[in-house]
Amino acid sequence: MNKSTLNNPVFYVSAFVVFLLVIIGATLPNRFGAVAEKLFHFTTIHFGWFYLLAVFVFVVFLITLSLSKFGKIKLGATLTKPEYSFFTWIGMLFSAGFGAGLVFWGVAEPMSHFFKTPFPAVEAMSEEAARVAMGYAFFHWGVSQWSVFAIVGLVIAYLQFRKKRRGLISTSIQPIIGKNKFIADTVDSLAVIATVMGVATSLGLGILQMNGGLKSVFDVPTSIWVQMAIAGVMLITYLISSSTGLDRGIKWLSNINLGSLFIIIVFVFMAGPTVFILNTFVLGLGDYFSNFIGYSLRLTPYTGDTWVREWTIFYWAWSTAWSPFVGAFIARVSRGRSIRQYVLGVLVVSPAIACIWIAAFGGTAVYNDLMNGTSIAEAVNADIAVALFETYQHLPMTTILSILSIFLIFTFLVTSADSATYILGVMTSRGSLNPTLVTKIVWGLLITAIAVVLLLAGGLEALQTASLISALPFTVILLLMMASFTRMLSKGEKKAEQDKE
């Protein structure tokens, strides 16, 4: 660990706060969970409108920016070429973004909406419920969620590679708040805390999901010992990957992830109800586009229904809490892209892959329940972890598909953890693009230790809920980043025009 880390208050403050929260979560999981739940509910009830409006603004801003004259500006020097091939770049975006989550929720979400519909007037498990379920699943995994990551990544990439400044959240809002060390350290500490808590809980929940998959396929018992073994293998794998750097470990894993994802999609598409999947995809896209503004700003103040809070607002809070990590990683791998290319990759290609996955897997599950009288929706309602494997029961080569999916979840989680250790190293090394291996190992060990401790104590979901509370201040920070970026961009463009004259 170098001096830039040891002398950085961000490292000590964030490590202390995380340690404190983990101790509370491990010793008082129920009480901690109740308090975290109450605080999170307070933010979603009173500021749900703010989340929805902010994310909608992000989408409009990014699309407008990409289509404007600023779209051709490079994230780097004018002649800089992209650091990674398009396929590898998309694989990296997807792996850091939400790969492991999509593998499960690609079936679980549409089937959850099919079983309990977003609109009270729509009859559950009907043809109309299926249509609404697919449209809403597309919406939740589409451009809105990615716009949150894209804002952070765009501003940091512009600062790092165009302006040669530190790639920190605090640096990105400096034009608005000025050079205030206390505010800067507070913002960066909050980013580190949210990243550690978010990644650790996702790792823990991913381990539980993998254990569920192993039980479904190989009848491996659900036990803490199995989960600790999975955590140990995962730790060793992502520390080895981390030691090889971005150009080897994460790059290779990302290519494997995206390649495996496409292989599974193609198989399900060919072996499943092919025409139904195609129809579902096209209809789902149509519903997504036609309902985009309505879904983006949907609230239910007249009925008191909680569905939007439980789903849409929860998703936007989750995305915002994760945005410092995912956005910073996206920035790191996007050097050499123009703003227009960046928005196309992050805001169009990545969500499109997600929608294709949902259409293939969610469409197959819906088809079987509607046409063949299966009970996948009921099974998912009882246990979300079985969603994917329950769907595989109605496809050929069930065991091979299940093994491939468990492997894919594992590699996605490893890539996310590896990416997180790198970004945490950057954040706690004053923005250095090459944090030391020791710094990355320290964060890797801490993330795994937190996940295992909370698996033992049963405090994972409490810590996850607590991490989502950070979404409220981060939504404000993201809006400041957007305003700051607009100011920097207009000044930079004006200066460039003057230099030409």
Curated annotation (Swiss-Prot):
Where does this protein chiefly localize?
membrane
Pfam families, per database record? BCCT
Q: Which GO terms describe its molecular function?
A: transmembrane transporter activity
- Decide whether keyword Nucleotide-binding is in the record: no
Query: InterPro entries from the entry?
Result: BCCT_transptr
Q: In which domain of life is the source organism classified?
A: Bacteria
Q: Which GO terms describe its cellular component?
A: plasma membrane
Q: How does the protein's chain sit in the membrane according to the entry?
A: Multi-pass membrane protein
> Where located?
Cell inner membrane
Transmembrane feature ranges: 9-29, 45-65, 86-106, 137-157, 190-210, 220-240, 258-278, 311-331, 343-363, 395-415, 441-461, 465-485
Question: Its induction, per UniProt?
Answer: Induced by high salinity and cold stress. Induction is mediated by SigB, the master regulator of the general stress response.
Keyword Cell inner membrane in the entry? The reply is yes
Q: What are the entry keywords?
A: Cell inner membrane, Cell membrane, Membrane, Stress response, Transmembrane, Transmembrane helix, Transport
PANTHER family of this UniProt entry? HIGH-AFFINITY CHOLINE TRANSPORT PROTEIN, HIGH-AFFINITY CHOLINE TRANSPORT PROTEIN-RELATED
Q: What does this protein do?
A: Mediates the import of ectoine and hydroxyectoine, which function as osmotic and cold stress protectants. Also has minor uptake activities for the compatible solutes proline and glycine betaine.
The similarity annotation says: Belongs to the BCCT transporter (TC 2.A.15) family.
Q: What is this protein called?
A: Ectoine/hydroxyectoine transporter
* Organism in which the protein naturally occurs: Virgibacillus pantothenticus
Source species taxonomy: Bacteria, Bacillati, Bacillota, Bacilli, Bacillales
